[in-house]
């Protein structure tokens, strides 16, 4: 079944500007600026006012209409990023060998360096994306805090760190060592 026209209305909060040109979305807010390319999704954008945008799909089937809600969620995540920001907390879990995690900079590129994982001599490195800040927690022992404006960048960095510390060729019920996401949320909860 084809839907003749389906639309969603996205409200824009005060202090945030959204510019859309050729399906390239640019969101500017108090914390900075984010851009997202949506050229691969066939949707139309109409600016109703400075505070609202209408996203429309013409002659779309079920999957095409489902992409409409995805586009709305992606832009809403950009708006949340430039107003409040995203923060992920990760905890080190180890039974015997204490995991040593440092943030190092090499040739202008930052890395998270993981040493002594399961007592291994190998040093594991994860590249930190632009716009993401990584720091060791000052209040909690064995905790890493990732924060930034882009939900995709922060969550992908957290996933990369968790993935590089996967235990292979051993029973994962017994070997629980690793670095895991313990908490995710917003930097400014009240904004």
Predicted features and spans:
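Ribosome-associated RNA-binding proteins
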Residues: 1-191
